[in-house]
Protein backbone atom coordinates (compact mmCIF):
# COMPACT_ATOMS: atom_id res chain seq x y z
CA UNK A 1 0.00 0.00 0.00
CA UNK A 2 3.03 2.28 0.37
CA UNK A 3 3.81 1.98 -3.33
CA UNK A 4 3.80 5.23 -5.28
CA UNK A 5 0.70 5.58 -7.45
CA UNK A 6 2.90 6.57 -10.37
CA UNK A 7 5.36 3.69 -9.93
CA UNK A 8 3.88 1.80 -12.88
CA UNK A 9 4.67 4.74 -15.15
CA UNK A 10 8.42 4.70 -14.45
CA UNK A 11 10.30 3.75 -17.58
CA UNK A 12 12.66 1.06 -16.11
CA UNK A 13 9.69 -1.11 -15.05
CA UNK A 14 9.18 -3.55 -17.91
CA UNK A 15 7.13 -6.74 -18.18
CA UNK A 16 9.39 -9.78 -18.01
CA UNK A 17 8.70 -10.93 -21.57
CA UNK A 18 10.51 -10.28 -24.87
CA UNK A 19 8.15 -7.47 -25.89
CA UNK A 20 10.67 -6.28 -28.48
CA UNK A 21 9.80 -9.35 -30.54
CA UNK A 22 6.11 -8.44 -30.44
CA UNK A 23 6.84 -4.83 -31.42
CA UNK A 24 8.96 -5.96 -34.36
CA UNK A 25 6.18 -8.28 -35.55
CA UNK A 26 3.42 -5.65 -35.36
CA UNK A 27 4.13 -4.19 -38.86
CA UNK A 28 3.21 -7.60 -40.29
CA UNK A 29 -0.41 -6.72 -39.46
CA UNK A 30 -0.27 -4.21 -42.31
CA UNK A 31 0.42 -6.97 -44.84
CA UNK A 32 -2.34 -9.53 -44.30
CA UNK A 33 -2.35 -10.83 -47.89
CA UNK A 34 -1.80 -14.56 -48.03
CA UNK A 35 -0.75 -16.82 -50.91
CA UNK A 36 -3.56 -19.21 -50.03
CA UNK A 37 -6.73 -19.29 -52.07
CA UNK A 38 -8.82 -19.30 -48.89
CA UNK A 39 -7.60 -17.11 -46.03
CA UNK A 40 -7.78 -18.17 -42.41
CA UNK A 41 -9.82 -16.31 -39.82
CA UNK A 42 -6.93 -14.22 -38.52
CA UNK A 43 -6.03 -12.86 -41.97
CA UNK A 44 -9.70 -12.24 -42.74
CA UNK A 45 -10.04 -10.31 -39.47
CA UNK A 46 -6.93 -8.26 -40.29
CA UNK A 47 -8.22 -7.42 -43.75
CA UNK A 48 -11.64 -6.45 -42.40
CA UNK A 49 -10.11 -4.25 -39.70
CA UNK A 50 -7.72 -2.47 -42.07
CA UNK A 51 -10.42 -1.93 -44.68
CA UNK A 52 -12.85 -0.56 -42.10
CA UNK A 53 -10.34 1.83 -40.54
CA UNK A 54 -8.89 2.97 -43.87
CA UNK A 55 -12.41 3.62 -45.19
CA UNK A 56 -13.24 5.75 -42.15
CA UNK A 57 -9.94 7.64 -42.26
CA UNK A 58 -9.31 8.14 -45.96
CA UNK A 59 -12.80 8.64 -47.43
CA UNK A 60 -12.56 12.41 -46.93
CA UNK A 61 -9.12 12.78 -48.53
CA UNK A 62 -8.15 13.59 -52.08
CA UNK A 63 -5.44 11.75 -54.01
CA UNK A 64 -2.58 13.57 -52.25
CA UNK A 65 -4.03 12.91 -48.82
CA UNK A 66 -4.52 9.21 -49.53
CA UNK A 67 -0.75 8.78 -49.85
CA UNK A 68 -0.70 9.00 -46.04
CA UNK A 69 -2.88 5.89 -45.71
CA UNK A 70 -0.08 3.48 -44.75
CA UNK A 71 1.34 5.92 -42.20
CA UNK A 72 -2.05 6.44 -40.55
CA UNK A 73 -2.70 2.69 -40.43
CA UNK A 74 0.73 2.17 -38.87
CA UNK A 75 0.00 4.91 -36.35
CA UNK A 76 -3.31 3.49 -35.15
CA UNK A 77 -1.83 -0.01 -34.86
CA UNK A 78 1.19 1.27 -32.94
CA UNK A 79 -0.80 3.34 -30.45
CA UNK A 80 -3.46 0.66 -30.02
CA UNK A 81 -0.89 -2.10 -29.46
CA UNK A 82 1.14 -0.07 -26.94
CA UNK A 83 -2.03 0.84 -25.05
CA UNK A 84 -3.13 -2.80 -24.90
CA UNK A 85 0.32 -4.07 -23.89
CA UNK A 86 0.31 -1.51 -21.09
CA UNK A 87 -2.70 -3.26 -19.55
CA UNK A 88 -0.61 -6.35 -18.82
CA UNK A 89 0.39 -6.68 -15.14
CA UNK A 90 3.65 -4.96 -14.16
CA UNK A 91 4.10 -3.54 -17.65
CA UNK A 92 4.98 -0.04 -18.78
CA UNK A 93 2.65 1.99 -21.01
CA UNK A 94 4.68 4.33 -23.24
CA UNK A 95 1.63 6.45 -24.09
CA UNK A 96 1.38 7.63 -20.46
CA UNK A 97 4.50 9.69 -21.13
CA UNK A 98 3.73 13.17 -22.48
CA UNK A 99 7.18 13.36 -24.06
CA UNK A 100 6.48 10.32 -26.25
CA UNK A 101 3.04 11.55 -27.28
CA UNK A 102 4.46 14.96 -28.15
CA UNK A 103 7.13 13.15 -30.15
CA UNK A 104 4.38 11.57 -32.23
CA UNK A 105 2.00 14.53 -32.40
CA UNK A 106 4.41 17.32 -33.34
CA UNK A 107 6.03 15.65 -36.41
CA UNK A 108 2.68 14.43 -37.77
CA UNK A 109 1.01 17.79 -37.21
CA UNK A 110 4.05 19.60 -38.60
CA UNK A 111 4.09 17.39 -41.68
CA UNK A 112 0.42 18.13 -42.34
CA UNK A 113 0.90 21.88 -41.88
CA UNK A 114 4.01 21.99 -44.07
CA UNK A 115 2.14 20.01 -46.74
CA UNK A 116 -0.61 22.62 -46.63
CA UNK A 117 1.78 25.54 -46.97
CA UNK A 118 3.53 23.85 -49.90
CA UNK A 119 0.43 22.81 -51.83
CA UNK A 120 -2.09 25.51 -50.84
CA UNK A 121 -0.11 28.49 -49.60
CA UNK A 122 -2.83 31.11 -50.04
CA UNK A 123 -5.55 28.93 -48.52
CA UNK A 124 -3.34 28.06 -45.54
CA UNK A 125 -2.53 31.71 -44.88
CA UNK A 126 -6.22 32.60 -45.27
CA UNK A 127 -7.02 30.43 -42.22
CA UNK A 128 -5.30 33.01 -40.02
CA UNK A 129 -7.83 35.68 -41.02
CA UNK A 130 -11.51 34.69 -41.43
CA UNK A 131 -13.38 36.40 -44.23
CA UNK A 132 -15.33 39.52 -43.27
CA UNK A 133 -13.26 40.30 -40.17
CA UNK A 134 -13.54 43.97 -39.09
CA UNK A 135 -10.28 45.87 -39.56
CA UNK A 136 -9.73 46.70 -35.84
CA UNK A 137 -9.95 42.98 -34.95
CA UNK A 138 -7.48 41.75 -37.58
CA UNK A 139 -4.31 41.79 -35.38
CA UNK A 140 -6.10 40.07 -32.49
CA UNK A 141 -7.64 37.36 -34.67
CA UNK A 142 -4.34 36.62 -36.38
CA UNK A 143 -2.73 36.10 -32.96
CA UNK A 144 -5.62 33.91 -31.77
CA UNK A 145 -5.59 31.76 -34.91
CA UNK A 146 -1.81 31.37 -34.68
CA UNK A 147 -2.05 30.24 -31.06
CA UNK A 148 -4.87 27.82 -31.90
CA UNK A 149 -2.75 26.34 -34.70
CA UNK A 150 0.31 25.74 -32.54
CA UNK A 151 -1.73 24.36 -29.64
CA UNK A 152 -3.16 21.53 -31.78
CA UNK A 153 -0.26 19.05 -31.27
CA UNK A 154 -0.14 19.86 -27.55
CA UNK A 155 -3.86 19.16 -27.17
CA UNK A 156 -3.45 15.97 -29.20
CA UNK A 157 -0.68 14.67 -26.94
CA UNK A 158 -2.26 15.80 -23.65
CA UNK A 159 -5.59 14.16 -24.55
CA UNK A 160 -3.96 10.77 -25.11
CA UNK A 161 -1.75 11.05 -22.02
CA UNK A 162 -4.57 12.12 -19.71
CA UNK A 163 -7.03 9.44 -20.82
CA UNK A 164 -4.55 6.56 -20.57
CA UNK A 165 -3.07 7.76 -17.26
CA UNK A 166 -6.48 8.32 -15.66
CA UNK A 167 -7.63 4.80 -16.50
CA UNK A 168 -4.47 3.22 -15.12
CA UNK A 169 -4.71 5.22 -11.90
CA UNK A 170 -8.35 4.21 -11.39
CA UNK A 171 -7.47 0.54 -11.85
CA UNK A 172 -4.58 0.92 -9.40
CA UNK A 173 -6.73 2.65 -6.76
CA UNK A 174 -9.69 0.27 -7.01
CA UNK A 175 -7.36 -2.74 -7.03
CA UNK A 176 -5.66 -1.49 -3.87
CA UNK A 177 -9.03 -0.85 -2.23
CA UNK A 178 -10.16 -4.38 -3.10
CA UNK A 179 -7.09 -5.91 -1.45
CA UNK A 180 -7.55 -3.75 1.65
CA UNK A 181 -11.25 -4.61 1.99
CA UNK A 182 -10.76 -8.38 1.67
CA UNK A 183 -9.73 -8.62 5.32
CA UNK A 184 -12.39 -6.16 6.52
CA UNK A 185 -15.63 -6.75 4.62
CA UNK A 186 -15.90 -9.54 2.08
CA UNK A 187 -19.15 -8.26 0.56
CA UNK A 188 -17.75 -4.80 -0.09
CA UNK A 189 -14.56 -6.33 -1.44
CA UNK A 190 -16.61 -8.43 -3.88
CA UNK A 191 -18.46 -5.33 -5.08
CA UNK A 192 -15.23 -3.42 -5.65
CA UNK A 193 -13.76 -6.45 -7.43
CA UNK A 194 -16.72 -6.51 -9.84
CA UNK A 195 -16.22 -2.78 -10.42
CA UNK A 196 -12.54 -3.47 -11.07
CA UNK A 197 -13.38 -6.09 -13.71
CA UNK A 198 -15.84 -3.75 -15.43
CA UNK A 199 -13.31 -0.93 -15.35
CA UNK A 200 -10.64 -3.18 -16.84
CA UNK A 201 -12.96 -4.12 -19.71
CA UNK A 202 -13.72 -0.44 -20.20
CA UNK A 203 -10.00 0.33 -20.24
CA UNK A 204 -9.49 -2.14 -23.09
CA UNK A 205 -12.12 -0.22 -25.06
CA UNK A 206 -10.54 3.12 -24.12
CA UNK A 207 -7.14 1.87 -25.32
CA UNK A 208 -8.50 1.27 -28.82
CA UNK A 209 -10.76 4.33 -28.86
CA UNK A 210 -7.89 6.66 -27.95
CA UNK A 211 -5.75 5.19 -30.72
CA UNK A 212 -8.61 5.81 -33.15
CA UNK A 213 -9.22 9.37 -31.89
CA UNK A 214 -5.53 10.29 -32.10
CA UNK A 215 -5.24 8.98 -35.66
CA UNK A 216 -8.56 10.51 -36.71
CA UNK A 217 -7.49 13.97 -35.53
CA UNK A 218 -4.21 13.65 -37.42
CA UNK A 219 -6.27 12.66 -40.47
CA UNK A 220 -8.47 15.74 -40.04
CA UNK A 221 -5.42 18.00 -39.74
CA UNK A 222 -4.13 16.45 -42.95
CA UNK A 223 -7.49 16.95 -44.67
CA UNK A 224 -7.45 20.65 -43.79
CA UNK A 225 -4.06 21.03 -45.49
CA UNK A 226 -4.44 18.94 -48.65
Curated annotation (Swiss-Prot):
GO MF annotation: an example: proton-transporting ATP synthase activity, rotational mechanism
Residue stretches in coiled coil: none
Compartment annotation: Mitochondrion inner membrane
Protein name: ATP synthase F(0) complex subunit a
Catalytic reaction(s) noted: H(+)(in) = H(+)(out)
Origin species: Ovis aries
Tagged with keyword Zinc: no
GO biological process entries: proton motive force-driven ATP synthesis; proton motive force-driven mitochondrial ATP synthesis; proton transmembrane transport
Amino acid sequence: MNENLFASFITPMMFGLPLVTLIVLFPSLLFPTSNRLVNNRLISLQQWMLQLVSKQMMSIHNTKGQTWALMLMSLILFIGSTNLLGLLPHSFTPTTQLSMNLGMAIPLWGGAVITGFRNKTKASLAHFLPQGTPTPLIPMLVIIETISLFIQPVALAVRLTANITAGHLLIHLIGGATLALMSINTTTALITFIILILLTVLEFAVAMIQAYVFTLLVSLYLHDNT
